[in-house]
Regions:
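Glycan-recognition and catalytic cores of secretory/periplasmic carbohydrate-active enzymes
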Residues: 1-306
Length: 306
């Protein structure tokens, strides 16, 4: 792959991250007609006049935690980063952290986000984002093992994992929150990231409680398998309440993370193998459009997300 530089950019969520966009989403989820109309307007501007609307809104190009982490992963995979440059990328990644203190190291969106599950501030760390930074830290450490800063920061993500709220615990099953905050609903794909994170610590963190890391990863996997539908799909939320859905985006995350966990922990489980196979079949049969070589976004939906 041809090398390219990581530079500030416009993001698809720029407009929704503004105070106006946040208020529209709040009203949308409350069912306000005015907010629904405004949401259509924002989406239309994003589709037809993306650059013009950003100039009008005075949106600045920026970097986000997930893009920096993903770039590092790709750059390491393609040998774009030298030993000397690894320190610079480590510093850049650290600048994106939501929490960086003596007890925890974690990452979020980098901007305020309004969802059905609550309002998350720009400094709220997410379990769906932090694992990418964890993997990036491990990659940077592999480039320069003598630099212990990256592995020390990786080890500190344990504090973030342990700060997540237990949403379900019983019968060898465990489910955690999306962020270290009170949330009304359990997000299934988020728990696949939590299980992956504990698996990464089990393999790479020599200071953590290995038994805790292994058991939590395994119990979360058990919970994910338990919540898989008979047709192989996973709902976004682990409930039957309004606003739930199945989309290709998050379905792929669940399957991808389960495959990684199976490899990391060398799990020989017929139930896990079956869950992965059924999940892949669901994605192919319900999302993939063979005639155009693309996938559709939803297979099950309640309301359209703004």
């Amino acid at each position: 792959m041809k090398k390219f530089d990581l530079i500030p950019y416009y993001d698809p969520y720029d407009l929704w991250a503004t105070s106006f966009g946040q208020n529209v989403r709040k009203g949308f989820y409350k069912g306000h007609l005015k907010s629904k109309i405004m949401a259509v307007g924002i989406a239309s501007c994003e589709l037809f006049i993306p650059n013009l609307i950003r100039k009008f809104a005075r949106t600045k190009k920026s970097l986000h935690p997930i893009s920096v982490a993903q770039y590092i992963l790709m750059a390491c995979e393609n040998s774009w980063i030298s030993i000397g440059e690894s320190l610079d990328y480590l510093a850049l990644l650290r600048e994106q952290a939501a929490i960086d203190d003596g007890e925890s190291f974690s990452f979020g969106l980098g901007f305020t986000w309004v969802s059905k599950n609550g309002i998350y501030t720009s400094q709220e760390p997410f379990i769906t984002h932090t694992p990418y930074a964890m993997e990036a830290l491990l990659k940077l450490n592999s480039i320069d093992p003598s630099n212990l800063d990256s592995i020390k920061l990786f080890n500190k993500t344990w504090g973030f994992l342990e700060s997540l709220i237990v949403m379900f615990n019983g019968n060898d099953k465990l489910a955690l929150s999306y962020a270290p905050a009170d949330e009304p609903r359990i997000v299934i794909n988020a728990n696949s990231y939590a299980a992956l994170s504990y698996a990464l610590h089990f393999i790479n963190n020599h200071d953590c409680d290995k038994e805790v890391a292994y058991l939590k990863a395994l119990n979360i996997v058990n919970w994910i398998i338990y919540n898989q539908r008979l047709d192989g799909g996973w709902m976004y939320y682990a409930d039957n309440l309004p606003g739930n859905f199945i989309d290709c985006f998050h379905s792929c995350f669940v399957v991808k993370n389960l495959i990684k966990i199976r490899a990391l922990l060398s799990l020989e489980s017929s139930e896990l193998n079956e869950a992965i196979d059924n999940g892949i079949d669901y994605i192919i049969n319900n999302f993939y459009q063979k005639d155009v070589g693309l996938v559709k976004r939803f297979s099950v939906r309640d309301i359209k997300d703004p």
